C-alpha cells in the first residue's frame, strides 16, 4: 500500500465527475493537473451522463437557461480564457446545436474510461479531447477524430475506440452516472475529496487547500 513519504498517509483519492463537453473542465485542466502533482493525489476521471443527472440534481443545462444567464456564461468564459491565457472558442464549430443527438459527447468519455481501464493515465487524453472541441475546432463526436487525437497524445487510438462500447466501459459509465447522482453532482466538473464536493474550476483553490490540510492531518 502506498503512503505519502511526508506523513505516512495514504495518497488522497480524488474523483472528477465531468463531461467531455465542459469548457470549464478544459479551462481547469492544467490547474487540476498541477494540484494532483503537488499533492501526489490519485486522480480518477469519471465521465458521466451529464444530461441525465443534472436536471435531477438541481442544475440547469445551458440550453434551457434564460438568455441573461446564457450571455453571462459566455462573458465568464471570455474572462477566464483571458485570465488563464488559454485558447478557447466561445462558439466552437462542433458544439452541438439543438438538433444534434443528446449523446454526442458520450463517446469521448467512453474513450477516457477505456484508457483508464487499460491502466493508462488518461488525463492527457481527456485534456486533448476537450482542447480539440474548445480550442481546435475538431469534431470529437467523430470516431476518426478521436482516434487521431488519441494517437497524437501517445495512446493507441484504434484500440481505445474499439473499447468504447465494451461491456466494461459501459458499466463504468453507468456506475459513474449513478454515483454522480447519489453524491448530488449538479454541474461539471465536480471534484470529490473524502466525500466533499468542489464544483467548478473556480473552486480549485479550495481543493488545493483541502489537500494541504489533509496532508497535515488537520480539518
PLM segments and residue spans:
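A broad, low-specificity signal for short, low-complexity segments enriched in glycine/proline
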Residues: 6, 73-74, 149-152
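C-terminal cap of thioredoxin/glutaredoxin-like
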Residues: 10-16, 20-41, 124-219
Amino acid at each position: 500500500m502506498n503512503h505519502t513519504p511526508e506523513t505516512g498517509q495514504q495518497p488522497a483519492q480524488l474523483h472528477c465527475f465531468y463531461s467531455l463537453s465542459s469548457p470549464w473542465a478544459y479551462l481547469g485542466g492544467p490547474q487540476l493537473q498541477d494540484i494532483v502533482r503537488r499533492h501526489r493525489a490519485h486522480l480518477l476521471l469519471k465521465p458521466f451522463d451529464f444530461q441525465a443527472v443534472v436536471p435531477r440534481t438541481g442544475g440547469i443545462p445551458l440550453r434551457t437557461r434564460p438568455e441573461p444567464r446564457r450571455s453571462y456564461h459566455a462573458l465568464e468564459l471570455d474572462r477566464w480564457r483571458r485570465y488563464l491565457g488559454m485558447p478557447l472558442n466561445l462558439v466552437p464549430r462542433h458544439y452541438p446545436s439543438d438538433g444534434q443527438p443528446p449523446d454526442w459527447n458520450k463517446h469521448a468519455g467512453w474513450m477516457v474510461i477505456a484508457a483508464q481501464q487499460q491502466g493508462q493515465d488518461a488525463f492527457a487524453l481527456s485534456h486533448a479531447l476537450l482542447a480539440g472541441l474548445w480550442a481546435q475546432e475538431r469534431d470529437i463526436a467523430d470516431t476518426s477524430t478521436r482516434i487521431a487525437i488519441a494517437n497524437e497524445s501517445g495512446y493507441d487510438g484504434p484500440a481505445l475506440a474499439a473499447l468504447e462500447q465494451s461491456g466494461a466501459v459501459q458499466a463504468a459509465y453507468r456506475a459513474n452516472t449513478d454515483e454522480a447522482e447519489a453524491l448530488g453532482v449538479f454541474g461539471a466538473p465536480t471534484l470529490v475529496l473524502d466525500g466533499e464536493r468542489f464544483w467548478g474550476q473556480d473552486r480549485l483553490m479550495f481543493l488545493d487547500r483541502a489537500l494541504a490540510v489533509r496532508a497535515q492531518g488537520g480539518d
